[in-house]
A protein has these predicted regions:
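Extracytoplasmic
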Residues: 41-71, 253-258
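Helix-breaking motifs and short loop linkers at transmembrane-helix boundaries and internal kinks
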Residues: 68, 100, 121-126, 266, ...
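Conserved MFS/SLC helix-loop-helix module at the cytosolic interface between two early adjacent transmembrane helices
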Residues: 89-123
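Helix-loop-helix hairpin linking two adjacent transmembrane segments in secondary transporters
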Residues: 125-127, 156-157, 164-210, 256, ...
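Paired small-residue
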Residues: 126-134, 325-333
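Cytoplasmic helix-loop-helix junction between adjacent transmembrane helices
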Residues: 133-168
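Intracellular juxtamembrane helix-capping segments at the cytosolic ends
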Residues: 142-154, 340-355
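A late C-terminal transmembrane helix in Major Facilitator Superfamily
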Residues: 358-372
C-alpha cells in the first residue's frame, strides 16, 4: 500500500515537472512567434516611410509641371524632407524620451499618415512643403526609436539581425515601393501616390497597435548634461563620422549610378531601370546578411570587412565601368555590401550609448540616423 502511494506521489511529481517544462517551451514558442510579428510591424512602417522618402524623386517633374513651379523648387521637396529627418531624429527623440515606446510609435504613424494626406490634398506648393516637413519629422523619430524597440524584442545576440529586419522595409521600398509609386504618379497623378502611401501608413498604424508590445517603457528624459555628452563623447563622435563618411560614400555612388551605367557602360535607359531593380534586390539581401554577420562576429569586425569590401569594389568599378557585363557584375556585388553596414552601424551606436550615455540612448540613435 505504501509502495503504491509512493509510486503515485512520484508520478504526480513527474507530471507536474513535465507540465511546467512543457509550459515553459510553449511560452518560449509563443514568444519566438510574437517577436517576429512585432518586428514585422516595424518593417511595414519602415516600408511606408521609405516609400514616401524615395518616391518623390520620380515625381519631381510631374509636380513641377502641375504646380507651375521650377524643377529646383520641386527638388526642394527632397531637401525639406531631409531637414525634417535631421530635426526629428535627435531633437524630437530627446523631447519624447519619457513616452512609452508603443504610444510614441503609434503617434508617429498618425503624424506620418496625416502628412501624406495633407500632401494628397495640398492646394499649393507651400502646403506640400509643410506636408513633407511633417513626414520627415516622423521619419527621423521612427528610425531613432525603431532601432531600440527592435533590439528590445530579441536577445542581445540577435540585435543586429532585428535592426536589419526593420531596415529591410526601407530596402524593399527602394526596390518595389518607389517604382510602384512612380508608376501611380505617372498614370494617375502625383497626388494619388501620396494617397497610396497614406494607406500604407494606416496599415502600419494598425499593425503597430496590434503587434507591438505595450510594456516597452520610455526612457528617462535625457538631461542637458547627457545630451551634451552624446554630442561630445569621442567614441560616439567616431561612430557618427564613420556612418556619415562610410554610408555617404556609398550613397554618392548610388546617386550617380544610373548616368554612369548609361553613359559609361553604354546601357539603354530601359536596361538601367532593370539594373537598378537588380541592385535594389542585392541591397535587400545584403541588409539581412549584414545583420547576421554583425550578430555572429560582432559589429566592429563586420563593419571592417564590409567597408574594406566596398573600398575594393569602388576601386574595381573604375576599371569595369566602361565594360557592360563587368560593370553589371560589379554593381550587383556592390549592392550586397552597400546596405550591409547599416545594421552594424546602428547596433554599435546603441551598444556604445548604453555604455557611455545610458540615459540618452535614443538621442544617440537619432544622431546616427541623422548622419545617414
Amino acid at each position: 500500500m505504501h509502495l503504491t502511494q509512493n509510486y503515485i506521489e512520484i508520478l504526480n511529481i513527474f507530471v507536474i515537472k513535465t507540465s511546467r517544462h512543457t509550459a515553459c517551451h510553449l511560452i518560449t514558442d509563443v514568444t519566438e512567434l510574437f517577436m517576429p510579428l512585432a518586428l514585422f510591424a516595424l518593417t511595414i512602417s519602415a516600408f511606408a516611410i521609405g516609400t514616401t522618402e524615395f518616391v518623390i524623386v520620380g515625381l519631381v517633374p510631374t509636380i513641377a509641371q502641375q504646380l507651375a513651379i521650377s524643377l529646383p523648387s520641386a527638388g526642394m521637396l527632397v531637401s525639406i524632407y531631409a531637414l525634417g529627418v535631421a530635426i526629428g531624429a535627435p531633437v524630437l527623440t530627446a523631447l519624447t524620451g519619457r513616452l512609452p515606446r508603443k504610444q510614441l510609435l503609434v503617434a508617429l504613424m498618425v503624424l506620418f499618415t496625416a502628412g501624406n494626406l495633407l500632401a494628397w490634398q495640398a492646394p499649393g506648393y507651400m502646403t506640400l512643403i509643410v506636408a513633407r516637413l511633417l513626414t520627415g519629422l516622423a521619419h527621423g523619430v521612427f528610425f531613432s526609436i525603431g532601432s531600440t524597440i527592435a533590439t528590445s524584442l530579441v536577445p542581445k545576440e540577435k540585435a543586429a539581425s532585428a535592426i536589419a529586419i526593420m531596415f529591410g522595409g526601407l530596402t524593399v521600398a527602394l526596390v518595389t515601393g518607389v517604382p510602384l509609386g512612380t508608376f501611380i504618379g505617372q498614370h494617375f497623378g502625383w497626388r494619388e501616390t501620396f494617397l497610396a502611401v497614406s494607406m500604407l501608413g494606416v496599415i502600419a498604424l494598425i499593425s503597430s497597435q496590434l503587434l507591438i508590445p505595450a510594456n516597452i517603457p520610455g526612457r528617462a528624459a535625457a538631461s542637458i548634461r547627457d545630451q551634451v555628452k552624446v554630442l561630445t563623447h569621442p567614441r560616439l563622435l567616431l561612430i557618427y563620422a564613420v556612418t556619415a563618411l562610410g554610408y555617404g560614400g556609398v550613397f554618392t555612388a548610388f546617386t550617380f549610378l544610373a548616368p554612369m551605367m548609361q553613359d559609361l557602360a553604354g546601357f539603354s535607359p530601359a536596361a538601367v531601370s532593370w539594373i537598378l531593380l537588380g541592385y535594389g534586390v542585392s541591397v535587400a539581401i545584403g541588409n539581412i546578411w549584414g545583420g547576421k554577420l554583425a550578430d555572429k562576429h560582432g559589429a566592429v569586425p563586420a563593419l571592417k570587412f564590409i567597408f574594406a569590401a566596398l573600398f575594393v569594389l569602388l576601386m574595381v568599378f573604375q576599371l569595369t565601368a566602361s565594360t557592360q557585363y563587368a560593370a553589371l557584375a560589379t554593381i550587383l556585388v556592390m549592392g550586397i555590401f552597400a546596405f550591409g553596414n547599416v545594421p552594424g552601424l546602428q547596433v554599435y551606436v546603441v551598444q556604445k550609448a548604453e555604455q557611455f550615455t545610458p540615459n540618452a540612448v535614443d538621442v544617440a540613435s537619432g544622431l546616427n540616423i541623422a548622419a545617414f
